[in-house]
Amino acid sequence: MKLILRGIANEFIKSFSFKNFEIDQNFFDKLITKEAPAAANLITENEKINSYELAKLKLILEKHFIKLSNIYSNNRETVLSGKSLKINSTFLKIKDLENQLPLDPSYLKKDILHKGTVRSGDRISSNGDLFIIGDVNPGAIISANNNVYVWGKLFGIAFAGKNGNKNASVASLYLNPLQLRICEIVAIGPKEKPKGQHPEIAILEDNKIIIKPYFLNQNL
């Protein structure tokens, strides 16, 4: 599940993912003194959450002066639990849930270096190159105007050359994505797991996405 934190003027502040209501309260302690979020939206996919769990989350947020304003879920019981606590709760299909996930403004810089796992539901976008040190889990979406480099395992969706750059590429230590896109060309990830012990790179050749070994000193 994912919390979207917003300020007094409904401006986006930050989003983060968590599981089984394991929330680091120190996170809020640090955040509240710097950016003072006023409200939060909870977005859950395929998760059944009862009213007791939601009440617990609501209490944690209220202790940090954050109001749980909205719940968006594709699970009807979760929606009913939210309504029982008088929280504005909406049932949405999975594709509509994705529209509730804003991009972190800090990810709109030209070149981005992200350290850590990119979890399901997370989105990272760069106006230049995107460098990720960590794994990209299934359900995560990463994109860049230029190249995407993952120093880890790529299981999610990767989109390079989103501004029309046909020379863009996607490279990873372990390249097994759900979907690859370079410029306007889209390909489903390979059915077989990578067998080699070397990094791989996906590039465009003859309007097709091909995957080949990637050596750090090679010139593309």
From Swiss-Prot:
Keywords: Cell cycle, Cell division, Septation. One of its GO terms (biological process) is division septum assembly. Pfam families: MinC_C. It comes from the Bacteria. Interacts with MinD and FtsZ. Belongs to the MinC family. HAMAP family: MinC. Cell division inhibitor that blocks the formation of polar Z ring septums. Rapidly oscillates between the poles of the cell to destabilize FtsZ filaments that have formed before they mature into polar Z rings. Prevents FtsZ polymerization. This is Probable septum site-determining protein MinC. The gene is minC.
